[in-house]
């Protein structure tokens, strides 16, 4: 029997929308291999299931457990590249969301993960801060404070002991995708 790989997100918002229920219902199905991924952020479409087809990755929206046969048969899917919500975005940090398993280091590396880290190891602290400045990367909070400025202030603070504080508030559902 041929096994079909299905991709189903495993973050808090997707689970709240029913992804966990699908995973439970399909966990022992021999015709599929269920890959748990991070979400693409289109929570209004969750639970969303994806699979690879000869014409590319396709998705099924608001899926129920009894939708499995049509997904395995690739009937009624929507090309992921054609989802309007995703077409409006250029993803950098979240480029692999919905594609890789978030906690699988080997998958992360296969998709280019750690290249930035490896490159940064040869840079000076000042060069890293300059790269952050050029990137225009900002915090995701309401102030959208420039990341480079935070790092520069930490670097320039005269102290033998420094602290980095991360705001670990998940007030926005799914923040820690």
Question: What residues fall within each predicted segment?
Answer:
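Feature of Fe-S/electron-transfer and energy-metabolism proteins
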Residues: 1-177
